[in-house]
Regions:
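N-terminal leader/targeting peptides and immediately adjacent processing regions
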Residues: 26-83
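Peptidoglycan-targeting cell-wall enzymes and recognition modules
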Residues: 45-67, 94-169
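Sparse, context-dependent recognition of short Cys/His-centered cofactor- or disulfide-binding micro-motifs
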Residues: 5, 81, 107
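Short, functionally critical alpha-helical segments immediately adjacent to catalytic or ligand/cofactor-binding
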Residues: 80-97
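Short, flexible beta-strand-to-coil junctions
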Residues: 1-3, 91-92
Length: 205
């Protein structure tokens, strides 16, 4: 006589057996039940997932918070002074506006005819075209905050100085020297003061 048993959604034919064969089949079925029970983990016996704390700026604008978050996701920078220095320089260059041309005009990537453009005011032909070429290749919008942050952390000149930012223990003035190599600003302005301001507002959570 043939019986049928249900395991999940599968239907398996079962031939009535006796002796050793029946014992072996019983064990195989019990093993299947055991595996199924392992797949379901209750809250009581589950292992906690370790979540690394990150720096946040609760009083910052949405654009500032996005950039701070992505800097930590896309790189290994976890030093507060390093992050604050990068943030201070971006504030000085664009005030975290992606669609801004040098002089203050709010335009798209293709409409900025002269001077710098975007978050860090990409100015030279090579760096400006690099943004466009990157977004063409990786399907992002060169006028958007998201696209520019992706290019910013992947740009070769930033990659060369990245190990300095990923180190630990430097002061903001020391990190500013690395930022100068990255950006090469003409006027220093308030960028260092902005960096100090960010360092005071950032919290590790």
């Amino acid at each position: 006589m043939i019986k049928k048993i249900f395991i999940g959604l599968s239907i398996l034919p079962l031939i009535a057996l006796s002796g050793t064969a029946s014992t072996r089949l019983d064990k195989e079925l019990s093993d299947i039940t055991l595996v199924s029970s392992i797949d379901t983990v209750s809250e009581e016996n589950s292992a906690p997932i370790k979540v690394e704390p990150t720096w946040k700026c609760l009083d910052c604008s949405p654009n500032e918070q996005y950039v701070l978050k992505k800097l930590q996701e896309y790189t290994k920078i976890n030093d507060r002074n390093a992050l604050a220095t990068i943030m201070g320089n971006i504030k000085s260059e664009s005030n975290f506006r992606a669609n801004i041309c040098e002089g203050g005009a709010r335009v798209s990537y293709t409409e900025c005819r002269s001077g710098g453009f975007g978050l860090i005011q990409w100015t030279s032909i090579g760096r400006y075209r690099g943004l466009g070429n990157f977004c063409t290749k990786y399907q992002c919008d060169p006028s958007s905050l998201e696209g520019q942050v992706r290019w910013m952390v992947n740009e070769p000149i930033f990659q060369r100085v990245l190990p300095e930012f990923e180190g630990h223990g430097d002061t903001i003035p020391q990190y500013m020297s690395h930022a100068y190599y990255w950006l090469g600003w003409g006027i220093k302005g308030y960028r260092e003061q902005y960096a100090y301001d960010y360092s005071k507002k950032m919290v590790l959570t």
